[in-house]
Amino acid sequence: MVPSVVFWGLIALVGTAKGSYTHSVHSMNPHVHPRLYHGCYGDIMTMETFGAPCDINNLMNCGIHGSEMFAEMDLKAIKPYRILIKEVGQRHCIDPALIAAIISRESHGGAVLQNGWDHKGQRFGLMQLDKNMYHPIGSWDSKEHLLQSVGILTERIKAMKRKFPTWNTAQQLKGGLTAFKSGMETIVTPADIDGDLVDDVLARAKFYKRHGF
């Protein structure tokens, strides 16, 4: 009788310990599960977005559906960079899905680049740093270069927080995305945020969040 009691006691103890460990890992280290990790700049899954802009010449491939369609088209090209994107995202405390979304919009996962450059020779790398605004380092799809690009993005978001402390988290993130592309001086009021850019990026980011980024 005693051995049986001891056996079931050990089973209960192991089960309890395992459950506590799983809970503590997920609650203390959000990096474990991609859907729980959103970094230091807000949860993109809660942010409103309208997707890619619609106009008279683009009524079929616009809105959230259009953004998700383009994100899915780029998924195969971006998947090989998933581990790198996650590592860089966690290094800079920003959602990897947001990085993937920018890469999708700017370079389609590098598929349209020529030796890392756009067709005009003005923008470089997966996130397409403008050589007139920045000084790109490293090879176009290297960890070194992606760290630089994401570092610039997060600095722009932090600058928005300092410049506009009364803005909400979503506005500061969207302002940072706009400033990454256009420069800090272009943002004076929330109306200066590039809605076409940020709505498309956020819709793509939500897609990538649901696909393991």
UniProtKB/Swiss-Prot annotation:
UniProt keyword terms in alphabetical order: Disulfide bond, Glycosidase, Hydrolase, Secreted, Signal
GO cellular component entries: extracellular region
Cellular localization per UniProt: Secreted
Signal sequence interval, chain numbering: 1-19
Top-level taxonomic group: Eukaryota
Function, in words: May act as a potent antibacterial protein that may play a role in the innate immunity.
Name by which UniProt lists this protein: Lysozyme g-like protein 2
